[in-house]
Amino acid sequence: MNGFSTEEDSHDGPPAPPFFGQSCCLIEDAERCGRPAGNASFSKRIQKSISQRKLKLDIDKSVRHLYICDFHKNFIQSVRNKRKRKTSDDGGESPDHEVEVPEVDLFQLQVNTLRRYKRHYKIQTRPGLNKAQLAETVSRHFRNIPVNEKETLTYFIYMVKSSKSRLDQKSDSSKQVE
């Protein structure tokens, strides 16, 4: 009772969240969320969507990380998806392929990986971008890549059923040449 907590005292409270004891960085209705932080990070885009929908969520300035819990991640995604469905039902100009776009957090990637992506797709940017700017640029490009989902899934299922991969194909073709 000298102001220091002992190991016995710490067992009385709620269990410590996993991964370095980080909890969600959001404040909901003036109360800090106590759920364990997941791997989703609080970005400017998420902050913008929260303010547009007038949700009672804010970031706790006292924490040193930007990770949010899975509950809030799913909650924010569901609010965003409801809005997209409403615009497409009302006859809005929303294309069919953008209704169920999953959120991909490219900020989790390393800077070298983001640069390699930028170089591969020859994305034009100004020099000296920091990681956040680079991730945002790559994310915008990534969302606009057209994908033939049916063809991709059909090919994937075929490859799984035939127990082959591209590496198997390369080794088979090299054996035939010899």
Curated annotation (Swiss-Prot):
Disulfide bonds join C24-C25, C33-C69. Residues 80-99 are annotated as: Disordered. It holds the Pfam family zf-SAP30. Keywords: Disulfide bond, DNA-binding, Lipid-binding, Metal-binding, Nucleus, Repressor, Transcription, Transcription regulation, Zinc, Zinc-finger. One of its GO terms (cellular component) is nucleolus. Gene3D superfamilies: 3.40.1800.30, 6.10.160.20. Disruption phenotype: Morpholino knockdown causes defects in embryonic heart morphogenesis and pericardiac edema, with defects in heart function that are visible already at 3 dpf. In addition, erythrocytes appear pale due to decreased hemoglobin content. Detected in embryos at 2dpf (at protein level). Widely expressed during embryogenesis and in adults. Its main location: nucleus. The keyword Zinc applies. A zinc finger (Atypical) spans 24-72. Residues 83-85 are annotated as: Important for DNA and phosphoinositide binding. A motif (Nuclear localization signal (NLS)) lies at residues 81-86. It is found in: Nucleus, Nucleolus. GO terms for molecular function: DNA binding; histone binding; non-sequence-specific DNA binding, bending; nucleosome binding; phosphatidylinositol-3-phosphate binding; phosphatidylinositol-4-phosphate binding; phosphatidylinositol-5-phosphate binding; transcription coregulator activity. The keyword Transcription regulation applies. InterPro entries: His_deAcase_SAP30/SAP30L (IPR024145), SAP30_C_sf (IPR038291), SAP30_Sin3-bd (IPR025718), SAP30_zn-finger (IPR025717). GO terms for biological process: heart looping; negative regulation of transcription by RNA polymerase II; regulation of DNA-templated transcription. Belongs to the SAP30 family. The zinc-finger domain mediates direct interaction with DNA and phosphoinositol phosphates (phosphoinositol 3-phosphate, phosphoinositol 4-phosphate and phosphoinositol 5-phosphate). In vitro oxydation causes reversible disulfide bond formation between Cys residues in the zinc-finger domain and reversible loss of zinc ion binding. Functions as a transcription repressor, probably via its interaction with histone deacetylase complexes. Required for normal expression of numerous target genes. Involved in the functional recruitment of the class 1 Sin3-histone deacetylase complex (HDAC) to the nucleolus. Binds DNA, apparently without sequence-specificity, and bends bound double-stranded DNA. Binds phosphoinositol phosphates (phosphoinositol 3-phosphate, phosphoinositol 4-phosphate and phosphoinositol 5-phosphate) via the same basic sequence motif that mediates DNA binding and nuclear import. Interacts with components of the histone deacetylase complex sin3a, hdac1 and hdac2. Binds histones and nucleosomes. This is Histone deacetylase complex subunit SAP30L. It comes from Danio rerio (Zebrafish).
